[in-house]
């Protein structure tokens, strides 16, 4: 509850502190942020070439980072509660969004932002072990039930959370990840 020091002092015990408060908070930024504001600590992974592009002019996607950067991404994935991507990445690359590291004890939750439920029922991400959440703006219970049945995987959850513009409500999604899935980062 954050009142431990005051309780000890109230009991008449002399306490020096807080000590190294910022250093302690830096050890677990996800937990601290989720406990203070109800949102996870979000890391964004981007890569671009020196000319500011993320793909070749033809639209073909190539690795533009070196092995060290790719290893660092895997370490970040291994330490994350969830990995989030958009439907365009899923449609273009058919990723698994898994953490490929010896540090992985349990795969992170995979989350796809797909406002209109365009994901293919045979997308790789839907057929790997582990839980997947598809965040959508679709609110029709009938459409959601039909899509869930077509996907046919009990580890996949459709989560409806539309904003006023008919897109996925990112804040609502992030708050749900903290409150229901204990994803702090």
Task: Give a label for each model feature.
Residues 33-34, 43-50, 54-181:
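Active-site ligand-binding patch in enzyme domains
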Residues 5, 19-49:
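Proteins enriched for Cys/Gly/acidic motifs involved in redox and nucleic-acid/cofactor modification
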